[in-house]
């Protein structure tokens, strides 16, 4: 595949146009709508799914459109001209500027960033419209947590409140089960003030670097909708800049709330710039990966100075959250010796190797307060990495894993002293009966800071299907209180995922996250389920497809056996056929009941009941003793 920057503007336009056509095909009956907040520049995007009317024979009524959360950015707005060479509109630029607490720098602060900018070998692959970076003014703190603690409701917080409510209205079916929330808060409406309170308390984060004005603000916390993250990134074995940008736009179209760029191959700096400039969602990274590349992959040669420069480099590009493995302490490393699979985290193994080589404490831990100073100058959130997570179910919940978790709790408090936002990463591989212990301990030692887990995988026997083995654990831990789920693709443990794998992983994790919202009893979570169930009962096939997470797949599976357009209005599917459709039979029962006298007006005697039963028995035999009759 060609490098993205080798494509002409016309090629890029044609590529986007084709992508847009594909999206219209796979998300039919959907319209991009914007809900305005208290000011004209707060325009919150949502996807509105139009529904057809209920057939006259089934009651005949209008079905209101269903509003759903949308992460696709302006890529799905037909009114916006997309130019990947220029990047996305700067949604937050005015909000950042009006706070008057940042400076625009003359040039990049990091040594490596300056080197790449001057390197003529990167000229052909470099993003052409790099803006000068921002940094907090001396003595200022620009984090959303700092604003929240001061009592400020920022435009980002108002935006999020509107977005979380999904504009659910009285005319949609709001019935739902109460759920069990394990101590979480279920409000009937999310307000900007509630968002502020949750961020101030550390129970939620708004990952929003001041150098990433393109993002549409979102929130991660257990009292909000469960979010999902998608991992992308190149490796030494392959992938190009255009492939990674394409994966990012593809992932956000299917519902990824955040993206992690885990690139470890060539041109990491340039790849990340292209992704950030074109991403409507927060971008996370693992800075130690790039720092390791700077020392040619020799972990022992890592230094605090190299890592610090990498943090500043990425913060000035606009990375919204960093995974930092500061909890991998020297004393925990020997605890992994008897594990079946040892240390499986790349970041964890890098820091463990450094600690053993120098027999010194992890420099990410000893320099943690200095890291906080960098984070609060750009509003980069911590994603405190679980470098000692279990890599198989045999190693689940051991002393090394939980020792690190307690250290992450300590570091959370230290970050909060700087008003830096924090979420905590979790496992991993954990059998079902041991999952809740992880959630309970995390809530206790990290004081309800958002939990962000990779699955967990509930069994190790299904390579090629680990998106399923992990989604089981993800749904459970999401119900218990995890705020964001890191997706797993079918390629997990096997290879670098392609676009199809990315889609499969996201759809699987959207199911897990939504199931968790239902189980928690999150207000409005059941609206889409109710609408789809009603469409199914009324044989509105197109509405069923359009309301599903993957309309294209649902429609194609239906059409494999019933391809004709007339089948879209048929009162049966190929599973049961026309005679044995339970939905159709139930409709017949309803019609029969409506034509009979009500119990209020009809009180038959015992003799009348017996006579009625005899009559129905005779009718059954007269009709050939068939359970279902032709209608």
From Swiss-Prot:
Keywords: 4Fe-4S, Iron, Iron-sulfur, Lyase, Metal-binding, S-adenosyl-L-methionine, Thiamine biosynthesis, Zinc. Binds 1 [4Fe-4S] cluster per subunit. The cluster is coordinated with 3 cysteines and an exchangeable S-adenosyl-L-methionine. Zn(2+) binds at residues 429, 493. Disulfide bonds: none annotated. [4Fe-4S] cluster binds at residues 573, 576, 581. It is an enzyme of class 4 (lyase). Its cofactor is [4Fe-4S] cluster. Substrate binds at residues 231, 260, 289, 325, 345-347, 386-389, 425, 452. Homodimer. Catalyzes the synthesis of the hydroxymethylpyrimidine phosphate (HMP-P) moiety of thiamine from aminoimidazole ribotide (AIR) in a radical S-adenosyl-L-methionine (SAM)-dependent reaction. HAMAP family: ThiC. NCBIfam families: PRK09284.1, PRK13352.1, thiC. PANTHER family: PHOSPHOMETHYLPYRIMIDINE SYNTHASE, CHLOROPLASTIC (PTHR30557:SF1), THIAMINE BIOSYNTHESIS PROTEIN THIC (PTHR30557). This is Phosphomethylpyrimidine synthase. It comes from Acinetobacter baylyi (strain ATCC 33305 / BD413 / ADP1).
